[in-house]
UniProtKB/Swiss-Prot annotation:
<keyword id="KW-0687">Ribonucleoprotein</keyword>
<dbReference type="InterPro" id="IPR018492">
    <property type="entry name" value="Ribosomal_eL8/Nhp2"/>
</dbReference>
<keyword id="KW-0689">Ribosomal protein</keyword>
<dbReference type="InterPro" id="IPR029064">
    <property type="entry name" value="Ribosomal_eL30-like_sf"/>
</dbReference>
<dbReference type="GO" id="GO:0006412">
    <property type="term" value="P:translation"/>
</dbReference>
<dbReference type="InterPro" id="IPR004037">
    <property type="entry name" value="Ribosomal_eL8-like_CS"/>
</dbReference>
<dbReference type="GO" id="GO:0042254">
    <property type="term" value="P:ribosome biogenesis"/>
</dbReference>
<dbReference type="InterPro" id="IPR004038">
    <property type="entry name" value="Ribosomal_eL8/eL30/eS12/Gad45"/>
</dbReference>
<comment type="function">
    <text>Multifunctional RNA-binding protein that recognizes the K-turn motif in ribosomal RNA, the RNA component of RNase P, box H/ACA, box C/D and box C'/D' sRNAs.</text>
</comment>
<dbReference type="GO" id="GO:0005840">
    <property type="term" value="C:ribosome"/>
</dbReference>
<comment type="subunit">
    <text>Part of the 50S ribosomal subunit. Probably part of the RNase P complex.</text>
</comment>
<dbReference type="Pfam" id="PF01248">
    <property type="entry name" value="Ribosomal_L7Ae"/>
</dbReference>
<dbReference type="GO" id="GO:0001682">
    <property type="term" value="P:tRNA 5'-leader removal"/>
</dbReference>
<dbReference type="GO" id="GO:1990904">
    <property type="term" value="C:ribonucleoprotein complex"/>
</dbReference>
<dbReference type="InterPro" id="IPR050257">
    <property type="entry name" value="eL8/uL1-like"/>
</dbReference>
<dbReference type="GO" id="GO:0004526">
    <property type="term" value="F:ribonuclease P activity"/>
</dbReference>
<keyword id="KW-0694">RNA-binding</keyword>
Length: 119
């Protein structure tokens, strides 16, 4: 319903790995409410959306909001993987990088790959 493009598994893994690293040196928002606020306020650099969210309405607004605010976003297969990547013990439907810390180059590279998928 809300998945607008396919993301190869290796790119998902790269994105989750980046999210784990950013958690150490930068700033991450966890959960749909915090992610939505970060996008609306123009703070989000990259948004992660889990593909297995039920009910899908929880995150269905995020792709449109990201496109409206010109924020790149990526899908990951599992909310469990996303929860682990942001360092919480429970599943996470969505997350956002708001400060990439020392990983600007890695984030820029990933965002370029994502733009290639969206065409």
């Amino acid at each position: 319903m809300y998945v607008r493009f396919e993301v190869p598994e290796d790119m998902q893994n790269e994105a989750l790995s980046l999210l784990e690293k950013v958690r150490e040196s930068g700033k991450v928002k966890k959960g749909t409410n915090e992610t939505t606020k970060a996008v609306e306020r123009g703070l989000a650099k990259l948004v992660y959306i889990a593909e297995d969210v039920d009910p899908p309405e929880i995150v269905a607004h995020l792709p449109l909001l990201c496109e409206e605010k010109n924020v790149p976003y990526i899908y990951v297969k599992s909310k469990n993987d996303l929860g682990r990547a942001v360092g919480i013990e429970v599943p996470c439907a969505s997350a956002a990088i708001i400060n990439e810390g020392e990983l600007r180059k890695e984030l820029g590279s990933l965002v370029e790959k994502i733009k290639g998928l969206q065409k």
